Swiss-Prot record:
Protein name as catalogued: Ferrous iron permease EfeU
Record carries keyword Aminoacyl-tRNA synthetase: no
Subcellular location(s) per record: Cell inner membrane
Periplasmic side: 1, 56-69, 140-147, 201-244
Record key words, sorted: Cell inner membrane, Cell membrane, Ion transport, Iron, Iron transport, Membrane, Transmembrane, Transmembrane helix, Transport
UniProt entry tagged with the keyword Transmembrane: yes
TM region(s), chain numbering: 2-22, 35-55, 70-90, 119-139, 148-168, 180-200, 245-265
Topological region Cytoplasmic: 23-34, 91-118, 169-179, 266-276
Any GO CC annotation of this UniProt entry: high-affinity iron permease complex
Species: Shigella sonnei (strain Ss046)
Similarity comment: Belongs to the oxidase-dependent Fe transporter (OFeT) (TC 9.A.10.1) family.
Quaternary structure (record): Part of a ferrous iron transporter composed of EfeU, EfeO and EfeB.
Length: 276
């Protein structure tokens, strides 16, 4: 439940910030009449992401067992790529995202008789990018942790992001976004490492990867996945009490370079914003 909550909080807050920045800019430049048009783009993006997520989730339930495992592995790999890209992309563009959005709004509203649709599509693509990232991660998360709690966590995270977005827009709160994105990014890298190890496990169960399947270690006597804490670790970080050598290797092969890259100072002009 916690991982879907955190991911949807972060992704939802990114989308909320985009919408808030666009709405604030429209009001500040005496173009508040276009805010309704902006919301059309937001709703279309939300409908696309929701529909795509439901379609993929319902379709995969019809797959035979091996194809189901293969699909789970592919979705996990896609989720790892998206999460990693999300972390480092936000590091790179967060300082300039406000200027970029304002320039995009100006460009959209200068396109003659079609500027309304241009604004709709600009907002649609900006919000849909965040939503599609969430779709693939949630598909991977729901496959690893079944039941009602992961969807509930995702909905709570999204609801919290919406509330925070409105509070930021109205000026009711000031949030240290630099610290928020820094620590959630670090957490997400550990989540992605667990997904990468889970992808190897899924490919093995699909019959595609049968190398280094010896048990690396057995922690069942110390931290069983049947215990409360073990269950939490499994749901959050993909913890396995008796992982294979290949799972452990993939976990380290992904996580060590990712942490090193994350620890390096961002390039000039790409430092994170401090607050909003």
């Amino acid at each position: 439940m916690f991982v879907p909550f955190l991911i949807m909080l972060r992704e939802g807050l990114e989308a909320a910030l985009i919408v808030s920045l666009i709405a604030s800019y429209l009001k500040r430049t005496q173009r508040g009449r276009w805010i309704g048009v902006m919301w059309i783009g937001v709703l279309l993006a939300a409908a696309l992401c929701l529909g795509l997520g439901i379609f993929i989730n319902e379709t995969t339930g019809e797959f035979p067992q091996k194809e189901q495992e293969l699909f789970e592995g592919i979705v996990a790999v896609i989720a790892v790529v998206i999460l990693t890209w999300m972390v480092f992309w936000m590091r790179k563009v967060s300082r300039n995202v406000k200027v970029q959005l304002e320039q995009a709004v100006d460009s959209a509203l200068q396109r003659g008789n079609h500027h309304g649709w241009a604004l709709v599509m600009m907002v649609f693509f900006a919000v849909a990018r965040e939503g599609l990232e969430s779709v693939f991660f949630l598909l991977a998360a729901f496959q690893q942790d079944v039941g009602i709690w992961p969807p509930l966590g995702a909905m709570l995270g999204l609801a919290t992001a919406v509330v925070l977005g409105f509070l930021l827009y109205w000026g009711g709160i000031r949030l240290n976004l630099g610290a928020f994105f820094k620590w959630t990014s670090l957490f997400i890298l550990f989540v992605a490492a667990g997904l990468a190890a889970g992808a190897i496990r899924a490919f093995h169960e699909a019959g595609l990867w049968n190398h280094f399947q010896e048990i690396a270690f057995d922690m069942s006597a110390v931290l069983s996945t049947h215990s409360l804490f073990g269950t939490l670790m499994e749901g959050i970080f993909g913890y396995q009490e008796a992982p294979s050598v290949s799972e452990v290797a993939v976990w380290f092969i992904y996580l060590i370079p990712a942490l090193v890259a994350f620890a390096l100072p961002p390039r000039a002009g790409a430092t994170a914003s401090r607050s909003a």
